[in-house]
Amino acid sequence: MIIATGLAPILSMVKLPTRELVAVLVATSFAAGLNLYATVATLGLLARAGVLPLPPTLTVLTHWSVIAICSAIFAIEFFADKIPAFDLIWNALHTFIRVPVAALIAYRATAALSPWEQLAATLAGGVIALAAHGGKTAVRAAVTPSPEPISNMVLSLGEDGLAVFLTWFATQHPYSAAAIVGILLIIIAFLVRWVVRSLRALFRGAEEELGVASPPRT
C-alpha cells in the first residue's frame, strides 16, 4: 500500500496524450472483454515496471493486492474457461463483471477530460468490452457442441494470449493496437452473424427431425 501510494506522484507527472490515451483504452477495453483479470493484472504490472504511465485515478491498479487477486482469479479462469459447457456459464456470469469494470476503468482513466468526453469514453469502453465478450461467447456457443475438447481449449488459450498481448502492445503502439481492435470488431460482427444463422439452421433442423411444424411466415 505504501509503495503504491509512493507511485502516485510519479504517475501523475507522466501523462499520456489524450489521443494515445483513447487508443490505449480502445485496446484494453477489448482485452478486458476477453479476459478482465489478465488485463487488469497486466496493466498493474506494466505500470509498476514504468512501461505504462497510468493516470492518478488508476493507481489502485498498481497495488500488489489488486495484482495478486486478479492473477489468482485469472489462474482459476484459465482452467474454468477450458471446460466445455461450464465455460458458457462462466462467461454468462462475467457479462455483469467484464463490461462494467471496463467502463469503470475508462471512466477513471479519463477523469482529466471534460464531462462529455469522459462520458463518451466510458460508453465506448463498455460497448467495446461488450462486443469482445459477446463475440467470445457466441463463438464458444457454436464450438461447445463439438465432441472434441481441443477446439475449446485452443480458443481459450488464444483469447488469454490476445488479452495480454493487446494490453502490452497498446503501451508500445497505441494506434496500431486500436486499429487491430477495429479489425477484430468487424470480424466479430461477421462471426456473430454467422453463428446466429448457424444456430437458427440447427434449431430448424431439430424441429424437422422431431416432426414439429414451424408456424407459417407472413
What role is predicted for each listed range?
Residues 27, 104-110, 136-143, 156, ...:
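Generic transmembrane alpha-helix signature in multi-pass membrane proteins
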Residues 75-88, 135-144:
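C-terminal ends of transmembrane helices
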Residues 100-109, 118-138, 161:
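Mid-bilayer segments of alpha-helical transmembrane spans in multi-pass integral membrane proteins
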Residues 58-65, 110-119, 137-148, 197-209:
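A cytosolic-side transmembrane-helix exit/cap motif
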Residues 95-107, 151-165, 211-217:
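Small-residue-rich segments of transmembrane alpha-helices in multi-pass membrane proteins
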Residues 2-20, 47-64, 105-121, 169-179:
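Helix-coil boundary and interhelical linker segments in multi-pass alpha-helical membrane proteins
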Residues 63, 87-100, 120-122, 147, ...:
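Cytoplasmic-side transmembrane-helix entry/capping segments in multi-pass membrane proteins
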Residues 21-46:
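The first (N-terminal) embedded transmembrane alpha-helix
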